[in-house]
Amino acid sequence: MIRRPPRSTPLYSSAASDVYKRQELDDTLLMPKVAEILSQENVVGWFQGRMEFGPRALGARSIIGDPRSKKMQSVMNLKIKYRESFRPFAPSVLIEDVQNYFEFDRGSPYMLMVAPVSDQIRTPMTSDEEELFGIDKLNVVRSKLPSITHVDYSARIQTVHSQTNPRYHALISSFKEQTGCGVLINTSFNVRGEPIVCAPEDAYRCFMRTEMDYLVIENFLLHKSDQAKVVSDESWMNEFELD
């Protein structure tokens, strides 16, 4: 019997993922493998432990990607979240690296604080880019991390701490080891209008209904191409109105 602290969310056993085609890896193999997958501009559903209780996904029920990619913001919006392509995403950054990327010198573990992107990673707009209008101007690359940089050079930051979020911290650390970047895109594990996923079956359903490339449930890695085909039923996309 699995016991949980009072007022906690459920914790699911590994048996919950037994019905899916997946590869089981220990942390020493899983973290670098997922980091490599992310560095190749794949989108990953990340399901770990108990779900968050609050307004933001914090690395337990998250969809994650590479913030250095110029196309990742559009891809994650249009193909996963099913919303406007210009909607910005938030960064998860190692607490020890936060000042390397943002004008911010403290913790923000709940993704509630907004700060400017550091001058050292900003990309100045050219005179031609300044003349652009509307969506064309919104799509201008503004920093070395374009997928998490808002039009005003701000970002809503989540700092990730090894003591309180060890597995997510280990993943970002592995990504940094491979790429030199201690930041990931982090958005909630759901599509537009739906609640955040709770159970493994919720995560799998969202994974199969969207164009996510990989799903990680605890130590199990699932590739979309390995899964049984799902009969397409796009009526679910019409159940929720645009935000």
At which residue positions do the language-model features occur?
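Flexible beta->alpha loop and helix N-cap segments adjacent to enzyme active/binding sites
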Residues: S14-D243
